[in-house]
Amino acid sequence: MNKSNRIQTAELDWESIDGIEVPISKQFGDVYFSKDNGLLETRHVFLNGNDLSERLANLQDFEYFSVGETGFGTGLNILALWQLWQQVRPNNHSHLHAISVEKFPLSKADLIRALNVWDELKPLSKQLIEQYPLPLAGCHRLSFPEERFSIDLWLGDAQDIFPSMVKTKAVNAWFLDGFAPSCNPDMWEQNVLNNIVRLSNYGTTFASFSVAGVLKRGLKAHGIDISRPRGFGHKREMLKAIWKAPVSEEILFEPVSDTFHFTQQRIAIIGAGIAGLSTAWAFAQRGHQVTLFERTAPLSGASGNPLALLNPKLCPIEQSHEHLMTLSWQHALNFYKNFQAFRPIQIQQMALKNAQDLLDLTNQYPADIVTQQTSSLESDYPHIILTEAGAVSPHQLRDEILQHPGIELKIANITTLVSFENKVQLKSGNETTLEADHVVVCCARESAALFENYPLLKPIRGQVSWVDNSFATLPLHEAYSYGGYCMQLNTSELILGASFYPNRDDQEVLLDDHVHNFELIHSVFPHYAKQLPPVEQWQGRASVRAQSPDYFPVVGKMQNESRISTFAGLGSKGFLFAPLCSEVLVAQILGEAYPVPKSLLQKLDAQRFQKKVKPKKPYFKSQ
């Protein structure tokens, strides 16, 4: 990824033609869509050019069809694709996924203005605008499950992004867009085309308004058949292509599993903490049959606190495209807002150490995301305000997820997993409880009991406290982060957290931990802390988090061809990491597009510790 300070939004001029406002890029000196009629051009060039009406209408049950695009722009092509999907999609569980790249995204205000001219697309435009991402580099997944449609919008330079994409199932069709080659030559570089072909396969089609020599030569070099039918409006030609011929031996393709099937999968998930719940939801939303096993009760472990705070430690902005916490934060906000359990808030992050590094974020991130405002609580420490944050009620979220008709909860202690004939048997003692197509083990440190070699997860004791503060409540939409954290649990109680004791697995609520949590808030907000009742009157909950050796969650298959996966080691950021990591896990199992770059996928890989075995530093449980 190009080490720029931030994503630069598009600079636009506007030209009114027959009452239609046409945006023009100042960066590239070209229009975003045809002055004749951009929507009709999109249908002619990209939809008809890829024969999408017929192809989409004939998708099998549970088939996953993906369309790639080289320039998102105003989103017009994707909206036209979505509209076509509504018109022709079969009445089954097939899914349409779009992958688009944009170096200079429109601001939200400009996007609204640009799309306002297309009355027939307004119902779809509204949904797109609601999920339109913050202008931060990396992949932003927009999900519309009721439509069986999703978008991965990658912000950044195409020359950096396409090589970072990991191939699963091949992209089925491409919209080769992104301004004319004469205006934007970088988009049409051979490196970009090579990676577009790498992500494709025999049968993939390509369409473009451009018939420039650089594009034709680039595709022909890979054995792709090209035709030049009539273009739209005054344009004599357009490009239409299909990959039929064998590819050159010099092109190396990443191996793709042949085990992906267009059938409903029976998924068994062991463990009903936030990892298991979010994974169950991800599969069930795709129409698969999920059985969720829990030995005692859902949220009985570290996920069961009264409140979960989405409080990311943001990275320098040039690292945001592959920074797990930053990407997870954006994805989590988009995920949880669909639940009543979510409360949008802002977080005051105090600068206790390395203050300048934290304060510098206000010069890197957009001003409406990270600001320096006055505080509701008096403190001697500087701070920033993260305006896009949230709090989740875990038990309410659990109830909402378990209401999904595709999820069944069973209370059972699964002791053994046995693989056979493309199935996995789950056994409780000597009894077979279920046969599943895939199993995901989400049991934190106890996951190791179901694998031969499993990363050694460190126990970390933590205790949260809550206390009556009805005499001096804080705003419900604010939280405070200072090494610990505090915010309103409800209208009359303050919740404070959390103690942090590595290599301890005791779970008794201790007065010492209440004292610890009091001392944390007192060190930053002494005037307010002195008003709180004595710690002897506090309530609390203690639990044990599971932390991997390198602090990244453990996500995926422990063996390449296995039907048994794991998702554990989320540490103290379970509610932050879980929604995005569950999408990564589902992508691996079902062969869907990954919502993260290769560099981050490698850091999450469940097999990564198998390459790091050291005699003096064991990464695995002892046998």
Swiss-Prot record:
Keywords: Cytoplasm, FAD, Flavoprotein, Methyltransferase, Multifunctional enzyme, Oxidoreductase, S-adenosyl-L-methionine, Transferase, tRNA processing
Residue numbers spanned by region tRNA (mnm(5)s(2)U34)-methyltransferase: 1-244
GO biological process, one term: methylation
Disulphide-bonded residues: none
GO molecular function terms noted in the UniProt entry: flavin adenine dinucleotide binding; oxidoreductase activity, acting on the CH-NH group of donors; tRNA (5-methylaminomethyl-2-thiouridylate)(34)-methyltransferase activity
Source superkingdom: Bacteria
E.C. numbers: 2.1.1.61, 1.5.-.-
SUPFAM superfamilies in alphabetical order: FAD-linked reductases, C-terminal domain, Nucleotide-binding domain
InterPro entries: FAD-dep_OxRdtase, FAD/NAD-bd_sf, MnmC-like_methylTransf, SAM-dependent_MTases_sf, tRNA_MAMT_biosynth_bifunc_MnmC, tRNA_MNMC2, tRNA_S-uridine_synth_MnmC_C
Membrane-spanning ranges: none
Catalytic reactions on record: 5-aminomethyl-2-thiouridine(34) in tRNA + S-adenosyl-L-methionine = 5-methylaminomethyl-2-thiouridine(34) in tRNA + S-adenosyl-L-homocysteine + H(+)
Pfam families: DAO, Methyltransf_30
Gene Ontology, cellular component aspect: cytoplasm
Cell location: Cytoplasm
Cofactor section: FAD
Keyword Methyltransferase found: yes
FAD-dependent cmnm(5)s(2)U34 oxidoreductase: region residues: 270-623
PANTHER family documented for this protein: SARCOSINE DEHYDROGENASE-RELATED, TRNA 5-METHYLAMINOMETHYL-2-THIOURIDINE BIOSYNTHESIS BIFUNCTIONAL PROTEIN MNMC
Similarity remark: In the N-terminal section; belongs to the methyltransferase superfamily. tRNA (mnm(5)s(2)U34)-methyltransferase family. In the C-terminal section; belongs to the DAO family.
Function comment: Catalyzes the last two steps in the biosynthesis of 5-methylaminomethyl-2-thiouridine (mnm(5)s(2)U) at the wobble position (U34) in tRNA. Catalyzes the FAD-dependent demodification of cmnm(5)s(2)U34 to nm(5)s(2)U34, followed by the transfer of a methyl group from S-adenosyl-L-methionine to nm(5)s(2)U34, to form mnm(5)s(2)U34.
Protein name: tRNA 5-methylaminomethyl-2-thiouridine biosynthesis bifunctional protein MnmC
Biological source species: Acinetobacter baumannii (strain AYE)
Lineage: Bacteria, Pseudomonadati, Pseudomonadota, Gammaproteobacteria, Moraxellales
